[in-house]
Amino acid sequence: MSAEVALVYRVLPDSAEVNIEKLKNDVINKLAPKYKVDKVEVEEIGFGIKALRLYIRMPESDEYSSDEIEELLRSVEGVGGYELEYFSRLSF
């Protein structure tokens, strides 16, 4: 069995007016089915702004990349920015 890679992204909306639940669903739908979103947390930033923390798992393969994930995130309406917070190889 091949190893997997775990990534954690923090995704910021482009304004406080963005519906965070809609943004969460749009991001998950954009990444699926290729990338597995294991968990999503909503984080209060301040001044009415909330961020998403995405826990993503993918196979360690040339067919999958963090560059592609970031390209998909940029294409979602309402995403103002993102940051890769954690990246680790998983193997059992």
Swiss-Prot record:
Gene3D superfamilies: 3.30.70.60. Transmembrane segments: none annotated. SUPFAM superfamilies: eEF-1beta-like. GO terms for molecular function: translation elongation factor activity. Keywords: Elongation factor, Protein biosynthesis. It comes from the Archaea. InterPro entries: eEF-1beta-like_sf, EF1B_bsu/dsu_GNE, Transl_elong_EF1B/ribsomal_bS6, Transl_elong_EF1B_B_arc. Pfam families: EF1_GNE. Belongs to the EF-1-beta/EF-1-delta family. Promotes the exchange of GDP for GTP in EF-1-alpha/GDP, thus allowing the regeneration of EF-1-alpha/GTP that could then be used to form the ternary complex EF-1-alpha/GTP/AAtRNA. This is Elongation factor 1-beta. It comes from Pyrobaculum aerophilum (strain ATCC 51768 / DSM 7523 / JCM 9630 / CIP 104966 / NBRC 100827 / IM2).
